[in-house]
């Protein structure tokens, strides 16, 4: 066979006809990243959990379950809105779950290089300040107001404790200035946090704010320092007030309430701090998504924070359900001689809960130069610490929405 091939080649006869079809070349392989049948990049951009449907689906399940549980509890309180001086603060505390959960979920859905999450997180952080103030105000209402509290603690020596941060107050006694400090420390956070939120949004618009950027030319460093100092002062005041009045608050079972609120705030605070440290140490690196967008390390840290909060809010909703039950208020409604119409009661309760009138009045009172001569007390007879105020249906809209206050000399307390 080889001899025949040689003879044909010598004679100039081609072995393959020119008219025969030539074999097609192999298909060209694109130089970019290869995509498998699942749509994930086989090389180049890694698979990112935070932007996956799995992360959004899991977080969504936790968020919507928490929303259903908490909204049902809020509805029960509005149906039995018999002690508005207490329940308006309870409802405000319960709202931390819908606001934290839904806000974090939206931030996770919009995670990307545009950093839309900064705007949502600002709303969440502002409500954090509102929660600290509302919890302190609820404790004041439990004990009958400033006048009733001072009647119990005034003149008593302050116990020195390193755990509660009173070791430097040895030899001092409680006075009206103590209550003023507790209120001012929480109210300042209600002022500082919105200012920092607006500042963050402005710096973000001008490209001067990036999460995790501790450069002295970046606004993140200064916003973080001011925020941490402000929230630490507010939490210290809340802790100090609980240390002082824990025996008076015992009938109201404050431990679960206190631990639940502190856990929600502290966990978000320390989680954010830990993630910032991990990002700073390079544990959380900058990544590139399959769409070609680059996500900074600070953006990823904020994304992990939002995902964790989505999961935690379900457990917070369950804990708050036990911490702030509505049975005691429902019993007062049953014993009421003339309960109001359900829809009227719910609508008026919502209006009173969302109204910031009491916060403005409290801020004016506690930062007034005349505070050292006066203290605040409700015109209705304040109950003794450890007892709920006497019932009534709360049906009178006027008596609930207009809580009259009078000033009496602190010397009379």
From Swiss-Prot:
<keyword id="KW-0967">Endosome</keyword>
<dbReference type="Pfam" id="PF03619">
    <property type="entry name" value="Solute_trans_a"/>
</dbReference>
<keyword id="KW-0968">Cytoplasmic vesicle</keyword>
<keyword id="KW-1133">Transmembrane helix</keyword>
<dbReference type="GO" id="GO:0048471">
    <property type="term" value="C:perinuclear region of cytoplasm"/>
</dbReference>
<keyword id="KW-1003">Cell membrane</keyword>
<dbReference type="InterPro" id="IPR005178">
    <property type="entry name" value="Ostalpha/TMEM184C"/>
</dbReference>
<comment type="similarity">
    <text>Belongs to the TMEM184 family.</text>
</comment>
<comment type="function">
    <text>Acts as a heparin receptor in vascular cells. May be involved in vesicle transport in exocrine cells and Sertoli cells.</text>
</comment>
<dbReference type="GO" id="GO:0030667">
    <property type="term" value="C:secretory granule membrane"/>
</dbReference>
<dbReference type="GO" id="GO:0005768">
    <property type="term" value="C:endosome"/>
</dbReference>
<dbReference type="GO" id="GO:0005886">
    <property type="term" value="C:plasma membrane"/>
</dbReference>
<protein>
    <recommendedName>
        <fullName>Transmembrane protein 184A</fullName>
    </recommendedName>
</protein>
<dbReference type="GO" id="GO:0031901">
    <property type="term" value="C:early endosome membrane"/>
</dbReference>
<dbReference type="GO" id="GO:0030658">
    <property type="term" value="C:transport vesicle membrane"/>
</dbReference>
<feature type="transmembrane region" description="Helical">
    <location>
        <begin position="130"/>
        <end position="150"/>
    </location>
</feature>
<feature type="transmembrane region" description="Helical">
    <location>
        <begin position="258"/>
        <end position="278"/>
    </location>
</feature>
<feature type="region of interest" description="Disordered">
    <location>
        <begin position="372"/>
        <end position="413"/>
    </location>
</feature>
<feature type="transmembrane region" description="Helical">
    <location>
        <begin position="223"/>
        <end position="243"/>
    </location>
</feature>
<feature type="transmembrane region" description="Helical">
    <location>
        <begin position="47"/>
        <end position="69"/>
    </location>
</feature>
<dbReference type="GO" id="GO:0030659">
    <property type="term" value="C:cytoplasmic vesicle membrane"/>
</dbReference>
<feature type="transmembrane region" description="Helical">
    <location>
        <begin position="187"/>
        <end position="207"/>
    </location>
</feature>
<keyword id="KW-0812">Transmembrane</keyword>
<keyword id="KW-0472">Membrane</keyword>
<dbReference type="GO" id="GO:0022857">
    <property type="term" value="F:transmembrane transporter activity"/>
</dbReference>
<keyword id="KW-0963">Cytoplasm</keyword>
<dbReference type="GO" id="GO:0008201">
    <property type="term" value="F:heparin binding"/>
</dbReference>
<feature type="transmembrane region" description="Helical">
    <location>
        <begin position="300"/>
        <end position="320"/>
    </location>
</feature>
<feature type="transmembrane region" description="Helical">
    <location>
        <begin position="93"/>
        <end position="113"/>
    </location>
</feature>
């Amino acid at each position: 066979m080889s001899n025949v091939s040689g003879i044909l080649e010598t004679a100039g006869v081609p072995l393959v006809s020119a008219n025969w079809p030539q074999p097609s070349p192999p298909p060209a392989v694109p130089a970019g990243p290869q995509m498998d049948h699942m749509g994930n990049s086989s090389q180049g951009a890694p698979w990112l959990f935070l932007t996956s449907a799995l992360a959004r689906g899991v977080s969504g399940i936790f968020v919507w379950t928490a929303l259903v549980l908490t909204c049902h509890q809020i509805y029960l309180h509005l149906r039995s809105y018999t002690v508005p001086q207490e329940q308006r603060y309870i409802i405000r505390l319960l709202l931390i779950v819908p606001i934290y959960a839904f806000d974090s979920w939206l931030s996770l859905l919009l995670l990307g290089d545009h950093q839309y999450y900064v705007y949502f997180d600002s709303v969440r952080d502002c409500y954090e300040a509102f929660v600290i103030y509302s919890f302190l105000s609820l404790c004041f209402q439990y004990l009958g107001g400033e006048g009733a509290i001072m009647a119990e603690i005034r003149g008593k020596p302050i116990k020195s404790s390193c755990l509660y941060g009173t070791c430097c107050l040895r030899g001092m006694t409680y006075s009206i200035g103590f209550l003023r400090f507790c209120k001012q420390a929480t109210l300042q956070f209600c002022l500082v946090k919105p200012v920092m939120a607006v500042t963050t949004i402005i710096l973000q618009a001008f490209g001067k704010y990036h999460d995790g950027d501790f450069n002295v030319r970046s606004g993140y460093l200064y916003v973080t320092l001011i925020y941490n100092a402000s929230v630490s002062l507010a939490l210290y005041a809340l802790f100090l007030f609980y240390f002082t009045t824990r025996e008076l608050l015992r009938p109201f079972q404050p431990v679960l309430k206190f631990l639940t609120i502190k856990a929600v705030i502290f966990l978000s605070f320390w989680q954010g701090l830990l993630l910032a440290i991990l990002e700073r140490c390079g544990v959380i690196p900058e990544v590139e998504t399959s769409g070609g967008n680059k996500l900074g390390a600070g953006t990823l840290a904020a994304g992990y924070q939002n995902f964790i909060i989505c999961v935690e809010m379900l457990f917070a909703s369950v804990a708050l359900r036990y911490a702030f039950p509505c049975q005691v208020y429902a019993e007062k409604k049953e014993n009421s001689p003339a309960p109001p119409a359900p829809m009227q009661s719910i609508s008026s309760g919502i209006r009173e809960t969302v109204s910031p009138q009491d916060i403005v009045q409290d801020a004016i009172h506690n930062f007034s130069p005349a505070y050292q001569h006066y203290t605040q007390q409700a015109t209705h007879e304040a109950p003794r610490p450890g007892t709920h105020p006497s019932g009534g249906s709360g049906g009178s809209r006027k008596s609930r929405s207009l809580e009259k206050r009078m000033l009496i000399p602190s010397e009379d307390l």
